Amino acid sequence: MQSAPALQEHASRFDEPVRALLRTKGRNPVWSVTPDETVYHAIEMMSERQVGCLVVLIGGQLAGIVSERDYARKVILKGRSSQETRVREIMTTPALFVTPEKTVADAMRIMTNRRVRHLPVLEGDNVVGMLSIGDLVNWVITSQQQTIKHLHNYIAGNYPA
């Protein structure tokens, strides 16, 4: 029977790099707009792509992020027109981000402490992915399911000697 430390590898999935979460999530495009586009265009794109945010790029570089929350708070509640308002007027800048080497726990901490639902992943100057709060919740659920499975196997004595 394996010892309890052998189970610890399954409990430390939060220490895995964001790169592992992106790999598990699969290759999803990161949708973007420029600061000069209308908020209407950005919201239309989010709706068509079924995403809650877009990265804002200037010359291929991350300039900010625009989300449904930005739209609700900075356009709708202020009585502004989405067809006349530019993305640059409501985007969140500078955008918070993580690198692929940061841990899943780091990403969770940033999202929780800063109360954001989306976090771009930057490798150098390139946006290589987007984490959502849903991605992190799925990671937690999968991690807990794996831990439960391994604990059941451990209790049942199904680990090799």
Give the residues covered by each predicted segment.
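Tandem CBS (Cystathionine beta-synthase) repeat/Bateman regulatory domains
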Residues: 1-161
